[in-house]
Amino acid sequence: VVGDGYSSKRHNARISVNTEVYDRLKLTGQMSYVDFYKKDLGYSGTSGVFRLSQRMSPLLPVMWQIPDENGRMVDSENWSYGSVRNPLQVAYESGMEERKTRVLNGIFNADLKIIDGLNVGMQYSANIYTRQVDEFNPKMLSYYSDGSPLKANEDAKDYISQSHLDVMTQTLQFTLNFNKTIGRHELGALLGFSQEWENRSTLGATRDNVMVEDIHVISAGMINFMNSGTKDEWALRSYFGRVNYAFDGKYLFEANLRADGTSRFAKGNRWGYFPSFSAGWNFSREKFMEFATSVLSSGKLRASWGELGNQNIPGNYYP
């Protein structure tokens, strides 16, 4: 990056707590916070400069020398991409982009032992993400290698923009877990419920013809007011269960069933039901494999079948 003032800063904080209450209740919690600041070039930042460098013809001079010995930056005309802006001009003459990002994560768990082999669990997690981007770019004039100006100079302008993004994602889950061993039989079962939801909002504004280049506030722009804003939210609710059985650690079976309901689909089409099954054979524990224990510590064959849903459609598809 060319010039002074370009920088990035990052601050991290993390805390973790674990405790047990009366040997039956376990509580854990973790929180983390990230504060990231970056000051970069305008016009897509340094990545834009690198992309332009790859597209610029190596046969063109960097500058076109005019009689007064002041150099004008040279742009190229490429039939594949159209006019390609001089990357050195972007590095020297473009404005600034300031990006501030804050992320707060938290997860809390509680596990209660009711009786031997029967536990109730609860988990809550939250992710809060905010990002603010302020950008200012002055008017940039461009010329071909023969000194003639690009037609784009007629529309060249300075502009200022600001954007803000807020996202909050939360998850709540409850489980009931059962495990029991009777002789050579191992039984297990799980029942659960989960709820996940997300709220997202954006706000942006752009102005042209900035009065004073040193004042980078949105109200400094005089013409071409453009404002935008969005809000969307979605939620996913799930019920799930699992049973598993093992005999003598050799023969294994597991069955799962889950029901998922999403707000991203229309009423009457929001719920889906998804089963899965698996069976396994731990052949390394059979007597006829005892001769190979020195070279094969574990050998297992497993077959499974299952279905899963997919709610990954654009957030504004429905409703």
Each PLM stretch: what is its role?
Residues 3-5, 263-268:
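Solvent-exposed loop/turn segments connecting transmembrane beta-strands
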Residues 1, 253-262:
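Transmembrane beta-strand segments that form the barrel wall of outer-membrane beta-barrel proteins
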Residues 11-15, 104-108, 168-174, 237-243, ...:
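Hydrophobic, lipid-facing positions within transmembrane beta-strands of outer-membrane proteins
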Residues 2-6, 16-103, 121-237, 285-319:
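Surface-exposed loop/interface segments of Gram-negative outer-membrane beta-barrel transport/assembly proteins
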Residues 110-114:
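His/Asp/Glu-rich mid-to-C-terminal helical/loop segments that flank catalytic regions of hydrolases
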Residues 249-250, 279, 285-286:
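Conserved helix-loop functional segments at active or binding sites
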Residues 31-35, 259-264:
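Conserved short loop/turn motifs at secondary-structure junctions
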